[in-house]
Amino acid sequence: MGLTKKEKVEKKARSVVKGKADKKAKVEKPSSKPAKSAKPSKSKDEVDELDDEFDEVEGLLEKGDVEEEDEEETNGNEDSEMSDDDEKDVEIEEEDDGEGSDLEEEESTAVVTTAPADAEVVHIASDAERKPFSTIPLSENTMQSLKDMGFETMTPVQEKTIPPLLAGRDVLGAAKTGSGKTLAFLIPAIEMLRKLKFKPRNGTGVIVVSPTRELALQIYGVARDLMANHSQTLGIVIGGNNRRQEEEKLNKGVNLLVCTPGRLLDHLQNSQGFVFKNLKALIIDEADRILEIGFEQEMKEIIKILPKERQSMLFSATQTTKVEDLARISLKKGPLYLNVDEHNVSSTAEGLEQGYVVCDSDKRFLLLFSFLKRNAGKKIIVFLSSCNSVKFYGELLNYIDLPVLDLHGKQKQQKRTNTFFEFINAKQGVLICTDVAARGLDIPKVDWIIQFDPPDDPRDYIHRVGRTARGSASGKSIMFLTPSELGFLRYLKAAKVPLNEYEFPNKKIANVQSQLEKLISSNYWLNTSAKDGYRAYLQAYASHHLKTVYQIDKLDLVKVAKSFGFNVPPKVNISIGASGKGAKSIKGKDNHKKRGGPGGKKFTR
């Protein structure tokens, strides 16, 4: 039988270099002409300043020269999203077609649920009755700060963590996101600095290490409020900040320092006036995330440099073998192991209603568009897998008068910070982002989490949905899956994640596909952005390590292209493997027309 028109198009789109990488494979070079971005009708790219309460972060929003911008993340470590540069290769493990591949994948995402052999184990009942902070011995200064911040009672994690930390114990904490662990480690740290009467000339007494800049900023904000009635000094050093200004402040003396790993190691090795010989406590927050994004070696170097006689606190939402290894070299023997989740039925928050929807690739954007239109008064976070996909969908939605904010790792630090705090302070709105916002960030009153692109593994799923239903609040989550991705559900079931299947009748989904395709074909800026987003989506998809679930060779590329507004898949190149090996040329018709400029357009229904 002859091929149908659709099958011919799909066959053409799947013209790839077969087998392992051909060193002589021709890789399409990106155009030398800079891509122009569609400007949203109501731009949110330029926010003049943060709220007054965050103006005290010296140098963070300086508009002058920023030394060595993104120096800390020269290898892309600080964010988990895929690199979207054509010339950058992506390390991909070859899929093992033999037996046992499923087992290897499950082991790579397995969570260790047993405590270290020498640890004293304390199980925490998440439904325990809350006790007031006044029941533990805290200074009047700290109690006043807690009152000013609106905190009167402790979460179960805080109740079990603060007393042993005040007593000087090393702690390994396994707590769900949203459990109140930031206060749990900051309160004892600040109390210790007060008790020892730290002054600027004494240098740094406490270091808090965070995986991402946004989480570091959030910890800094909480610490600043807690220290409002104390005399000790506070500082922050993160990638994207002005390094010279950071060093000047370190030279003056920072008693409590919040940081990201790469920038901390830089200052430890190169800032001569940085006094850390009096360090009394090291706090490693979101340790699993720090290791996942490639900072294992940096953390080992940091621990080698810092004084050995210190108290250490390590917190991690999931306990993996690498986290255990880090705990072994950073904690004293016989630490206190605090586990909130081990006996819980669910790995996610109790107030979270979560589900999934099965949707073909060509209907994904239509469903997202319809969902956002129907929930215009809600506060929603949409997770995507790559920077360029976030960029495209952000531009597209703003262009068609559906206002959204976007956040990803390719943005300058000032833009990321402004967007982050703008969304925090918003009562409603949509944030489209990569996993840069998936860990630890306390964004209030989020109604919905939409996982538009599926997460890499159950841990990523748990951290994404952890942005809603925080504390005692409620929230909802929905994950988009194609029929070929349903195998991911068994991984979630094994991780004790309860999901319901949602159904959306076709009549409730706005049929704007033809208008979308006309817009993308006629607008050069959106067409270029859509092509970049399409390529980035495929490259991110190829990078998934659950190869039996996410199989790029089984993607219907015609349908995938339609979700980016293309009638025919555009010609793109994705690099799979090291040094350009395994480059795949995914071909299609490059059908953009350079006409149409920035402006606003509405889809009619």
Swiss-Prot record:
Residues 1-118, 579-605 are annotated as: Disordered. It catalyses: ATP + H2O = ADP + phosphate + H(+). A motif (DEAD box) lies at residues 285-288. The keyword Nucleus applies. A motif (Bipartite nuclear localization signal) lies at residues 363-379. Gene3D superfamilies: P-loop containing nucleotide triphosphate hydrolases (3.40.50.300). Residues 162-337 form the Helicase ATP-binding domain. It is found in: Nucleus, Nucleolus. The Q motif is unique to and characteristic of the DEAD box family of RNA helicases and controls ATP binding and hydrolysis. ATP-dependent RNA helicase involved in 40S ribosomal subunit biogenesis. Required for the processing and cleavage of 35S pre-rRNA at sites A0, A1, and A2, leading to mature 18S rRNA. This is ATP-dependent RNA helicase HAS1. It comes from Yarrowia lipolytica (strain CLIB 122 / E 150) (Yeast).
